[in-house]
Amino acid sequence: MKHLTALWTVVLFGSLAAAYGQTAGNIYQATLGESGQRTAEVSTEQLRGVLADMSAVVLDARPLREYAISHIPGAMNVAAKPGVPMSAYVSDVAEVGRLLEGKKQTPIVLYCNGPYCGKSKRLAEELLAAGYTNVRRYQLGIPVWRALGGVTEIEPDGLRYVAANDQTTVLVDVRKAEDFRSGSLPNARSIPRSGVLEGKDVGDVKRAKDDGRLPIQDHNTRLIVIGRDVAEARYVAEALVREAFQNVAYFHGSFQDAQAALKP
């Protein structure tokens, strides 16, 4: 299966929680609860709080391309970057040191590709060994983040890669209808921000589900939302997540930035 469905994720999460002896409760407050780990986990609710009050540096421990395609908003990446000579790149730990200017007491939260992903665990251990004193993990990772209603962000390099390699992706242009008619991105579909209302199954989102602009037969289709600016795109992306679309990202840039990213 190309995309991880919300049902599969929640079933997996419930099975893992049972395996590790956790009782049922508020799923947003749950953690994987593994034993033998030297770094604490944070729940989805706690991570949302961290991002809201910027009380920790959130690091995506995945390779750069995965980060560029889809990451939790506000997270940064410390993997090797194309074009950086090996003499200038030592390790993820060294990149963390550069990012934090050597301040090893800085609160850090790591995440990667879900419960079975070992990258955040390995990086956490390496950071502890390097003297970092406040390292935690969102071990549920980006699949559960999405399943619990979290939107993600896509970078220009990620947009370029997806456009070239995933022909099932739906681009959603949320600018004004007249702006869309005057020119948009290849195969984009128009859902103007002005028609996206609060609530579920209302306004232009409902109409888009009925008329085929949104892929109602497959809620796991990748949706990339592009607007006049980031705020406009994020608003609509969050509305689509509330409609049970499971793979929604908004573009981190303006419409002109998206055009530039997709320019041949």
Regions found by a protein language model. Give the residues of each.
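Rhodanese-like catalytic fold shared by cysteine-dependent sulfurtransferases
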Residues: L4, S15-V42, A68-L110, G114-V170, ...
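Hydrophobic helical h-region of N-terminal Sec-dependent signal peptides
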Residues: T9-F13
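N-terminal secretory signal peptides
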Residues: Q37-L59, R65-E66
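Structural scaffold elements adjacent to functional motifs in cytosolic proteins
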Residues: V58-D60, L171-D173
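Beta->alpha turn/N-cap motifs
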Residues: R62-P63, F251
